[in-house]
């Protein structure tokens, strides 16, 4: 039996203490997208690493959610990624404590689906979609993504892997086309004002599906 490099329970004892601490990550502005795509295309790195960064930008997910993704988490026909609640930051503690929480649903744009299909060919037979090129049945390490960004020429104060998620959030909000609660639901953020005791994993799924396709088209045509 193999071991995963990620300790998904790490830091649970600090959740209550750090829950109000918010860190701002450097991110791409709208006018920076085209240059990022060019640098990523020219980057001398394994294709899976490059595709991981691109897929992260297209989906707006966190690092652990991305790197712990397995083939059976995806429904290619329905174009949906079903992320286990254990992999979601906000839900992890409840799952470990025994609560039953459904998978979190991430709609996939046509572009994200194409990226996924390419990666699945390279990682066929591996446990993880974004498999380590060096270690069997292990995902690529989170630090590998930031190292790749450094190789692209971005300093620590210019862009980080998590900053791709911030890019996603910022541009969607700035577009003025989508409601805040759709974007927050896509980011798996729990609405502090909601009265329901449980989180609905399918919140605004139809709206988020349309929004994610807009985002995929936006990234494809960014110049």
Predicted segments — roles?
Residues 4-69, 77, 122, 163-165:
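Basic, Lys/Arg- and aromatic-enriched nucleic-acid-binding interface segment
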Residues 10-17, 68-118, 191:
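Conserved tyrosine-mediated DNA breakage-rejoining catalytic core shared by Y-recombinases
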């Amino acid at each position: 039996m193999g071991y995963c490099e990620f300790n998904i329970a790490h830091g649970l004892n600090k959740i209550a203490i750090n829950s109000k601490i918010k860190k701002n990550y450097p991110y791409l502005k709208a006018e920076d997208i085209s240059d990022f795509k060019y640098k990523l295309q020219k980057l001398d790195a394994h294709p899976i690493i490059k595709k991981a960064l691109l897929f992260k930008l297209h989906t707006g997910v966190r690092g652990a959610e991305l790197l712990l993704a397995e083939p059976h988490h995806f429904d290619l026909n329905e174009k949906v990624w079903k992320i286990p609640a254990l992999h979601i930051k906000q839900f992890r503690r409840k799952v470990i404590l025994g609560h039953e929480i459904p998978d979190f649903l991430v709609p996939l744009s046509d572009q994200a689906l194409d990226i996924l299909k390419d990666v699945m060919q390279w990682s066929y037979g591996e446990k993880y979609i974004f498999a380590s090129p060096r270690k069997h049945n292990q995902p690529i390490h989170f630090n590998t993504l930031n190292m790749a960004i450094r190789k692209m020429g971005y300093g620590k104060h210019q862009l980080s892997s998590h900053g791709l998620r911030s890019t996603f959030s910022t541009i969607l909000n700035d577009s003025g086309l989508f409601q805040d609660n759709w974007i927050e639901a896509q980011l798996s953020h729990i609405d502090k004002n909601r009265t329901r005791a449980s989180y609905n994993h399918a919140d605004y799924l139809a709206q988020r599906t349309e929004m994610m396709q807009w985002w995929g088209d936006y990234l494809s045509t960014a110049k």
